[in-house]
Amino acid sequence: MGGAMVNGFLKGDIFRPSDITVSNRTQGALDRFADSGVSLTTDNGVAAAEADIVCVAVKPWVAESVLREIKSVMDYNRQMLVVVVAGLPSATILEWMKKEDGTVPALFLVIPNIAIAERSSMTFIVPVGASDEQTKTIKAIFDDTGSSLVTEERLLGAGTTLASCGIAYAMRYVRAASEGGVELGFRADDAKHIVLQTVKGAVDLLLANGNHPEAEIDKVTTPGGLTIRGLNEMEHAGFTSAVIRGLKAGTHT
């Protein structure tokens, strides 16, 4: 996810490459950004010390070691901390980051999805101990890489399922519809192109007019026609139920 975020920031309008420092313990992971103009380091402390916004995007099992590593170099009076780690509570993070004088950083729990690489993410933001101005700054950054929603920590699990796991669910529909297109007689590449453009068209319509999906479905559903027959077959097979069950299953840890 960290690499996807860097790609999105580089394609965006807020950061110049020289504004970004990327840190990873493995040089090989940094090599893909060698020609991008960003600063590269294998020292997390070096990366964190000079940043205005420190973003930690790591696997859950290494989060504690990374956060404790950078605590001593962070200046909580001027720096904000963004943590992109699924399932990690803010209380735990703040306990790890608490300094001897009891101070903690302005914290943001952030969950984007992989489409952030193309500036098409749906990103959830939870401010913890942050000012309105700080929250405005972080939201602007993630609005530049798609769309963002400032929400409550209790909804992060559901948001992860709906938007992050949801990418995979949407792609599974694309795969299924593409395979159906092949069975109907199209070449595989043509079928995928047709399905992708159709999905894009559906999304564009909903974004443009704000209608409920069912209102748009009604526009193309003629009584006794092909569309309603297909929809009913999908429902008989449990389409809506399967989607909801998948979403609910994805929120259980």
Which residues make up each language-model segment?
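NAD(P)+-binding Rossmann beta1-loop-alpha1 motif at the extreme N-terminus of oxidoreductases
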Residues: 1-42, 46-50, 120, 182-184
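Short acidic capping loops at alpha-helix termini that bridge into adjacent secondary structure
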Residues: 16-19, 77-79, 189
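Small-residue helix-packing motif on alpha-helices
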Residues: 20, 30, 47, 63, ...
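Rossmann-like NAD(P)(H) cofactor-binding subdomain of soluble oxidoreductases
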Residues: 27, 36, 44-125
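Internal alpha-helical scaffold of NAD(P)-dependent oxidoreductase catalytic cores
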Residues: 92-106, 122-158, 169-210, 253
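Short pre-catalytic strand/loop immediately N-terminal to key active-site residues, enriched for Gly-Thr
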Residues: 108, 156-161, 213-218
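NAD(P)-dependent Rossmann-like dehydrogenase/reductase catalytic/cofactor-binding core
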Residues: 196-253
